[in-house]
UniProtKB/Swiss-Prot annotation:
Gene Ontology cellular component terms for the protein in this record: cytoplasm
This protein's name: Chaperone protein DnaJ
Biased composition (Basic and acidic residues): 32-52
Domain notes: The J domain is necessary and sufficient to stimulate DnaK ATPase activity. Zinc center 1 plays an important role in the autonomous, DnaK-independent chaperone activity of DnaJ. Zinc center 2 is essential for interaction with DnaK and for DnaJ activity.
Subunit structure: Homodimer.
Organism: Methylovorus sp. (strain SS1 / DSM 11726)
Length: 371
């Protein structure tokens, strides 16, 4: 079956920006992740397709090669197999020029393949992001089959020479005037075939397992930051292990919104406090703090508490807490309260220029508009 177009897989246009590609991949990865769709092979296949497409389109060089040469520009094998990730452009097309200029080629590549880097999305609270902490995660990994030790063959048997490529790992294909050598679609470059599959892994050489890891979260991490766990990624065919990248996502906070090192919050105050001034108590990540409200404070006024934000990663100075005032209109008034407010309104109307200059100015503009 022919591979799907990577842009179609991610649902983006061919001129999509890096951010659009990243956003689309995140959405698909969350939707089709195997942990969210257990025992659903279609979802797992969609997840793999999205991951493969993103690995190419998020890399500038691979994307350029794909745009010019299609799938052959990034992965000549064009099919699933023990080789994960993608070779570079020179690997994919180096043999073409050897054929043209008499280099021949045809030697099988080394069988030591690297696996793929893994990604894990982790949600943490704003409080955990602000201070250094440690947590545990449980991740699915593809591990070498202990029964066949990664060969994919039934114990007591050995893989046999691939009948398609004769053990070379590559096949020659004619494309117009060019003779192109591509990775063998049958053995995926190994030069070997499994005649009797291992009963434990069905010939894949790997089995799905789960492992628990401890993740140290540095103080000041922000949305999208990555924590690298070296050697905790995939290991394929005895090759060196890749890495696991834990991607930080911040949970929505009930009070604060983060903007780099600064924190923002709404600060409702009564209209009497706004008019007369006073002192209120506000929450911070370190506890509570006192703030003085000057008389005649209006909705939209912002007060800054220096140093009460978050100290961003790799910086020494913490940000500030920005408190945005919202003057609250009283509700469910008693008759006595209504009476006092009407009395106050009568007094205000006697000198509205002084007591409500913005309202007076606005009404004057309205009158001028309709004249």
């Amino acid at each position: 079956m022919a591979k799907k177009d990577y842009y179609e897989v991610l649902g983006v246009n061919r001129d999509a920006s890096d951010e659009e590609i990243k956003k689309s991949y995140r959405k698909l990865a969350m939707k089709y992740h195997p942990d969210r769709n257990p025992d659903n092979p279609k979802a797992e296949e969609s997840f793999k397709e999205a991951k493969e497409a993103y690995e190419v389109l998020s890399d500038e060089q691979k994307r350029a090669a794909y745009d010019q040469y299609g799938h052959a520009g990034v992965d000549p094998s064009a099919g699933p197999g023990p080789r994960q990730g993608f070779g570079n452009f020179a690997d994919a097309f180096g043999d073409i020029f050897g054929d043209i200029f008499g280099g021949g080629g045809g030697n099988r590549r080394s069988n030591v393949y690297r696996g793929a880097d893994l990604r894990y999305n982790m949600e943490i609270s704003l409080e955990d992001a602000a201070r250094r902490t440690e947590t545990k995660i449980r991740i699915p990994v593809m591990s070498e089959c202990e029964t066949c030790h990664g060969s994919g063959a039934r114990p007591g048997t050995q893989p046999v020479t691939c009948t398609t490529c004769g053990g070379h790992g590559q096949v020659r294909m004619q494309q117009g005037f060019f003779s192109v050598q591509q990775t063998c679609p049958k053995c995926h470059g190994s030069g070997k075939m499994v005649k009797e599959p291992c009963p434990s892994c069905q010939g894949a050489g790997r089995v799905k397992k789960h492992k628990t890891l401890s993740v140290k979260i540095p103080a000041g991490v922000d949305e999208g930051d990555r924590i690298r766990l070296s050697g905790e990624g995939e290991r394929v065919n005895g090759g060196p292990p890749r890495d696991l990248y834990v991607v930080v996502h911040l949970k929505q906070h009930d009070i604060f919104q983060r903007d780099g090192g600064n924190l923002h919050c709404e600060m409702p105050i009564s209209f009497t406090t706004a008019a007369l001034g006073g002192e209120i108590e506000i929450p911070t990540l370190d506890g509570h703090a006192k703030m003085k409200i000057p008389p005649e404070t209006q909705t939209g006024a912002t007060f800054r508490l220096r140093g009460k934000g978050i100290k961003p990663l790799r910086t020494n100075d913490p940000g500030d807490l920005m408190c945005h005032v919202v003057v609250e209109t009283p509700i469910k008034l008693t008759e006595r309260q209504k009476e006092l407010l009407r009395e106050m309104e009568e007094i205000n109307l006697q000198d509205s220029d002084k007591h409500s200059p913005r309202a007076k100015g606005w009404m004057d503009k309205v009158k001028d508009f309709f004249q």
